[in-house]
């Protein structure tokens, strides 16, 4: 099972985030070994949604020099560690453009395909958040949805984590209905003969599926959008394992 890496400076809100996400704090906080540095603490996050249930591990990393820490994670010796990560949450109280750039370069260097969240642990959000796809800037102070009806704040973090591939045995599986890298989506055979599935529905579905395929999104987000689209169109006919036949 892959894990979540929560990384940040001392007093950057790592434990506040974990408490908000899971409802509890890691064991061992009273241990003298963790008095001045929370690196090495572990916890669990239980995911339950309509598609699966999983108990996902959380690793906590604390740094004083981010460049050195990311260099260590970029080394060949750390490849197994990187491969075991399903998501990274970088916590901070005050935005540091230099640190943000370090994370962006780290993601590009390793060609990471997992979600990387820049979580602003402050009561106020940035007026002009970084205009980059990843790390994704999220302000913990926001609630509900934005003007585009998209989840924000902690709900957005949960949404991202719900879409991750947590099972290591499935990491190398290609998402979607693509038969190859350049192919189109294909609908599961059992829907093609459905009396409720009209040709216009099929055409629209395939059009939207191909738009999802071509979108500049990570594989796990494409999968989530495809599943939501199928469920919306097919209603009671939709089965959770339909994406396995895509």
UniProtKB/Swiss-Prot annotation:
Phosphoserine carried by residues: 194
Pfam families: Adaptin_binding
Single GO MF descriptor: protein-macromolecule adaptor activity
InterPro entries linked to this entry: Irc6
Keyword match Phosphoprotein: yes
Keywords, alphabetical: Phosphoprotein
Entry keyword annotation includes Lipid metabolism: no
GO CC terms, sorted: cytosol; nucleus
PANTHER family in UniProt: INCREASED RECOMBINATION CENTERS PROTEIN 6
Protein name in the entry: Uncharacterized protein C19A8.11c
Species annotation: Schizosaccharomyces pombe (strain 972 / ATCC 24843) (Fission yeast)
């Amino acid at each position: 099972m892959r894990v979540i890496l929560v990384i940040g400076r001392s007093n950057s809100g790592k434990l506040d985030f974990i408490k908000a996400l899971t409802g509890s704090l890691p064991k061992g906080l009273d241990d003298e070994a963790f008095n001045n540095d929370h690196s090495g603490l572990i916890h669990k996050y239980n995911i339950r949604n309509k598609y699966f249930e999983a108990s996902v591990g959380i690793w906590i990393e604390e740094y004083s020099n981010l460049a050195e820490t990311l260099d260590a994670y970029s080394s060949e010796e750390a490849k197994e560690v990187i491969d075991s990560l399903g998501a990274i949450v970088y916590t901070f109280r005050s935005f540091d453009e230099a640190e943000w750039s370090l994370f962006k370069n780290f993601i590009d260097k390793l060609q990471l395909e997992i979600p990387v969240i820049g979580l602003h642990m402050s009561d106020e959000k940035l007026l002009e958040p970084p205009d980059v796809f990843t790390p994704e800037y999220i302000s913990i102070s926001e609630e509900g949805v934005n003007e585009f009806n998209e989840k924000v704040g902690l709900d957005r973090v949960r949404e991202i984590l719900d879409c991750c591939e947590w099972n290591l045995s499935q990491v190398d599986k290609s998402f979607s209905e693509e038969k190859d890298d350049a192919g189109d989506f294909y609908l599961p055979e059992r829907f093609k003969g459905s009396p409720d599935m009209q040709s216009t529905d099929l055409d629209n579905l395939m059009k939207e599926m191909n738009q999802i395929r071509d979108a500049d999104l990570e594989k796990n987000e494409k999968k989530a959008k495809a599943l939501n689209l199928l469920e919306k169109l097919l209603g009671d006919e939709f089965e959770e394992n339909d994406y396995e036949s895509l």
